[in-house]
Every structure is written in structure tokens, then in C-alpha cells.
Amino acid sequence: KFSKNFSALISSKKCVVAADTRPSGHIIVETVKAGLMESGIDVYDLGVVPTPITFRESRKYGAGLVVTSSHNPIEWNGLKMIIDGIGINNKQLDTVIKDQVTNKSKIGTEHYIKSDYINDAAKIIGKISGTPKVTVDVGGGAAKTVASELLKKIGCDVNTINDDLV
């Protein structure tokens, strides 16, 4: 229901979707994608990525939705809704909460994408001289998909720990 109502705010008819590593994330993402596509929104699935990457990508596509619950207990989950790189405001939240009539003339399409974040960040940072040895504790979070890869790309010898806690 919430993703269908959220679709009323998406003028671009495109939305990036992502999740953190919580066990319930996958099933919620699939439900969210179905609601968006049923409402005519083309969905671009980033998979598991940190929330800021979804905010960044939402500026390209017009909207974003992250399934996450940040620092709450692991059994909790929620939806962060984004329009043009900014979390929705109270007026937009009212639209999401109230039932909306959505355009069902076309079904949206589903795409699996990868953000250019790592390449873009590596260009800004540049190569590190030498090959420093770095251990990264990602704590089982969504950074597990980017932290080690970025450090390797800029020239570090990376040892990743705690990448699969959930």
C-alpha cells in the first residue's frame, strides 16, 4: 500500500530501490517493487547498499526507497522514501499514508543496476601510495557491499571482517 501511494509522488516514473542487510529486507523489497511497478513506476534495484548511495542515485532517477531500520533492533524494518535526493516531507508523507488513485495503464519494468559510487569516490580520492594493509569491520551492515571494494580500488590491501553477521 505505501509503495503504491508513494508512486503518486514520483513524477519521473522511475525509482531506485535498495535495502540494508536485515533478514526481512528481501521480502519487503520484493513487495515494494511489485507495488511500484503495478502503479506504472520503472524500478531500478540497487540490491544491498548503504542508504546514502540510494539517496545519491535517487537524484538521477527522481525517486528512491530504502528498506532499512538503521540502528533499531534487527527484527524491525521500515521504509525511507526519497524524492530527488531528499527524504519526503510531512505533506508528502500524508500522501503516502492516505489511499491514492494510481495510474494502472502500464506496468513498470524492473532493472538491476549498480551504482557508480565506488568509481566516482575512487576518482575523487585517488590512488594511495604504497599498499597499506587495512582491516575493515563492516559489522554485517550494508557497507559490506562497498567499503572493501572502494579501499581496494584506491590501492589498499583489505581484510574484511564481520561481513555476514545476519
Tell where the protein language model's regions lie, with residue ranges.
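Short, electropositive, low-hydrophobicity segments enriched in small/polar residues
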Residues: 1, 29, 51, 68, ...
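An N-terminal, well-structured beta->alpha segment
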Residues: 1-34, 38-40, 108-134, 142
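N-terminal small/polar loop signature for handling phosphorylated ligands or for N-terminal nucleophile
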Residues: 4, 14-76, 149-166
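Gly/Ser/Thr-enriched, mixed-charge loops and adjacent short helices
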Residues: 75-166
